[in-house]
């Protein structure tokens, strides 16, 4: 899905009337939003959506803006030996990074690649760019911890309230 979005979003932005680009984006979004990708897997492996829900609930920003800001910071925060294989797979299969590179380099290039893609679309990359300061970060982190279930041990990488706050602070 991400590869599809990375291919067709620049086309749609360049030519908004391109039916094929719009159709591909809508088809990818349908799968991204309907939960089918998580069937049989428990919680999503991409919990930055839960973190972003607080951003757009507390502030007037779109889900896409919030994800563009949160995703690279979440990826950096959870990068470790346990998560490395998933980021390597993502980097190789989605971003076309050479599998011959060391795993850590692939993972870091994957994170940079995501960030650079969002930047290329003109998306905001920090909370400050969308008018969010640190005044409510702890409140939002608590809200996410209580309501989103991101600390579930069945999650790919469980996140505590402290983790969520650190991700939000890094995104400033």
Where are these regions (language model features)?
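Active-site segments that bind and position negatively charged phosphate/pyrophosphate groups
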Residues: 1-113
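C-terminal charged capping/lid subdomain of soluble metabolic enzymes
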Residues: 94-172
């Amino acid at each position: 899905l991400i590869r599809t979005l990375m291919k067709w979003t620049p086309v749609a932005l360049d030519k908004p009337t391109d039916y094929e680009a719009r159709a591909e984006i809508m088809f990818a979004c349908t799968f991204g939003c309907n939960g089918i990708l998580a069937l049989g897997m428990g919680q999503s492996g991409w919990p930055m959506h839960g973190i972003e829900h607080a951003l757009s609930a507390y502030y007037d920003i779109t889900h896409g803006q919030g994800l563009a800001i949160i995703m690279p910071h979440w990826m950096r925060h959870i990068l470790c030996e346990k998560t490395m294989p998933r980021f390597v797979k993502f980097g190789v299969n989605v971003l076309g990074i050479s599998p011959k590179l060391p795993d850590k380099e692939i993972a870091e290039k994957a994170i940079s690649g995501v960030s650079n893609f969002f930047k290329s679309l003109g998306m905001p990359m920090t909370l400050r760019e969308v008018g969010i300061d640190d005044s409510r970060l702890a409140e939002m982190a608590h809200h996410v911890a209580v309501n989103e279930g991101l600390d579930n041990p069945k999650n790919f990488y469980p996140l505590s309230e402290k983790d969520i706050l650190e991700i939000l602070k890094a995104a400033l």
